[in-house]
């Protein structure tokens, strides 16, 4: 039987901010929020890299917010366990 690894990615303002609960930015969370957010990979770049590593996007869920541009997206990826 095939086993899988999974990633749950949080996306805010077009940036992948957390993967499985771990911060993805190069600038620590806190302080300058814009700098922290800008240090995270954008969705397109992240998905390109993840695809090269064997990850497949299997689902996206959008959690609407009061401001439409502030919606929180959750990306769900999987790949076979090696």
Walk through the language-model features, giving the residues of each.
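Terminus-proximal functional modules
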Residues: 1-82
């Amino acid at each position: 039987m095939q086993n899988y690894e999974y990633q749950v990615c949080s996306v805010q303002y077009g940036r992948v901010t957390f993967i499985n609960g771990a911060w993805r930015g190069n600038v620590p969370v806190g302080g300058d929020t814009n700098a922290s957010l800008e240090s995270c990979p954008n969705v397109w770049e992240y998905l390109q890299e993840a695809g090269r590593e064997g990850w497949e996007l299997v689902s996206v869920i959008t959690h609407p917010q009061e401001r439409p541009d502030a919606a929180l997206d959750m990306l769900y990826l999987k790949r076979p366990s090696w």
